[in-house]
UniProtKB/Swiss-Prot annotation:
Tissue expression pattern: High levels in skeletal muscle and heart, low levels in liver, brain, and kidney.
Alphabetical list of InterPro entries matching this protein: GlycerAld/Erythrose_P_DH, GlycerAld_3-P_DH_AS, GlycerAld_3-P_DH_cat, GlycerAld_3-P_DH_NAD(P)-bd, Glyceraldehyde-3-P_DH_1, NAD(P)-bd_dom_sf
Protein name (Swiss-Prot/TrEMBL): Glyceraldehyde-3-phosphate dehydrogenase
Description of activity control: Glyceraldehyde-3-phosphate dehydrogenase activity is inhibited by fumarate, via the formation of S-(2-succinyl)cysteine residues.
Deamidated asparagine carried by residues: 7, 62, 68, 147, 153, 223, 314
Region entry Interaction with WARS1, spans: 1-146
Subcellular location field: Cytoplasm, Cytosol; Cytoplasm, Cytoskeleton; Nucleus
Domain notes: The [IL]-x-C-x-x-[DE] motif is a proposed target motif for cysteine S-nitrosylation mediated by the iNOS-S100A8/A9 transnitrosylase complex.
Subunit structure and binding partners: Homotetramer. Interacts with TPPP; the interaction is direct. Interacts (when S-nitrosylated) with SIAH1; leading to nuclear translocation. Interacts with RILPL1/GOSPEL, leading to prevent the interaction between GAPDH and SIAH1 and prevent nuclear translocation. Interacts with CHP1; the interaction increases the binding of CHP1 with microtubules. Associates with microtubules. Interacts with EIF1AD, USP25, PRKCI and WARS1. Interacts with phosphorylated RPL13A; inhibited by oxidatively-modified low-densitity lipoprotein (LDL(ox)). Component of the GAIT complex.
Biological processes, Gene Ontology terms: antimicrobial humoral immune response mediated by antimicrobial peptide; cAMP/PKA signal transduction; canonical glycolysis; cellular response to type II interferon; female pregnancy; gluconeogenesis; glycolytic process; microtubule cytoskeleton organization
Pathway per the UniProt entry: Carbohydrate degradation; glycolysis; pyruvate from D-glyceraldehyde 3-phosphate: step 1/5
Length: 333
């Protein structure tokens, strides 16, 4: 079991911790968050408005966070370079503050004794890995990696299956995306991106996303062939990708369904899901897949031009992939 520290006990930090407790390959030994004290950590970990109460025990004892009887060391450092990960036995660090996303900034964790850092966000310069798509390209000379974004983790497995079978000439992605913590509850100031500052609960907000372009980094053959945007909508969790693409080889919609289903039951099992049910977003809350293809929602204009729909729990599915990536990396030590 690889010993892991978590930096930033926000949505992803807490859910990575939850996911780790239902996985036997990753052992959370330390958590750092300068803004949340120990007793507050107990409360925030135990109660979750989106995913429900933690199914286990959590308490504070002797200055440690104790989850299911397992004591976890707590740090409250603002500067990553000052966190003594080594003293706590943490070999890997999940960088989930959303702040230290470059090689240089995330690299500060190595100073405190961590051996590797996994950034739980897209990174401008760290190599990005998406489980089921390019994780096998990881080699253990890499000390800092990124698990890309939740949307890239939804789009890339689907794009891979379609491209491998039919070839994608070009495509546009739209993600209809749930609210996240960076948004505002009511209208407020938002730096350069004025629309992002509008009230999250009362608007559909067009927003940028690098998720589609990032697919070109994890599937090099698709580089320059995909781009996309987002609509932020007033739901607390679960998002949906619409991939509209031109196919190289003509395909009936039933052919597409067939290959996606095969991938979901085979090589991409647990990562890509497949459903023919009449589902809506709530049906995917706390779903651990990166992406679930909605066979009944897609449409084809003709044999070369299709719109494909895939759901994802942007919090929990993604957090499970962070854990999977760490387990995979540990298997290569």
């Amino acid at each position: 079991m690889v010993k892991v520290g978590v930096n930033g006990f926000g949505r992803i930090g807490r859910l990575v911790t939850r996911a780790a407790f239902s996985c036997d390959k990753v052992d959370i030994v330390a958590i750092n968050d300068p803004f949340i004290d120990l007793n507050y950590m107990v409360y925030m970990f135990q109660y979750d408005s989106t995913h429900g109460k933690f199914n286990g025990t959590v308490k504070a004892e002797n200055g440690k966070l104790v989850i299911n009887g397992k004591p976890i060391t707590i740090f409250q450092e603002r500067d990553p370079a000052n966190i003594k990960w080594g003293d706590a036995g943490a070999e890997y660090v999940v960088e989930s503050t959303g702040v230290f996303t470059t090689m240089e900034k995330a690299g500060a964790h190595l100073k405190g004794g961590a051996k590797r850092v996994i950034i739980s966000a897209p990174s401008a310069d760290a190599p990005m890995f998406v489980m089921g798509v390019n994780h096998e390209k990881y080699d253990n000379s890499l000390k800092i990696v990124s698990n890309a974004s939740c949307t890239t983790n939804c789009l890339a497995p689907l794009a891979k299956v379609i491209h491998d079978n039919f070839g994608i000439v070009e495509g546009l992605m739209t993600t209809v995306h749930a609210i996240t913590a960076t948004q505002k509850t009511v209208d407020g100031p938002s730096g350069k991106l004025w629309r992002d500052g509008r009230g999250a609960a009362q608007n559909i907000i067009p927003a940028s996303t690098g998720a589609a372009k990032a697919v070109g980094k994890v599937i090099p053959e698709l580089n320059g062939k995909l781009t996309g945007m987002a609509f932020r909508v007033p739901t607390p969790n679960v998002s949906v990708v619409d991939l509209t693409c031109r196919l190289e080889k003509p395909a009936k919609y039933d052919d597409i369904k067939k290959v996606v289903k095969q991938a979901a039951e085979g090589p991409l099992k647990g990562i890509l899901g497949y459903t023919e049910d009449q589902v809506v977003s709530c049906d995917f809350n706390s779903n651990s897949h990166s992406s679930t293809f909605d066979a009944g929602a897609g449409i084809a204009l003709n044999d070369n031009f299709v719109k494909l729909i895939s759901w994802y729990d942007n919090e929990y599915g993604y957090s499970n992939r962070v854990v999977d990536l760490m387990a995979y990396m540990a298997s290569k030590e």
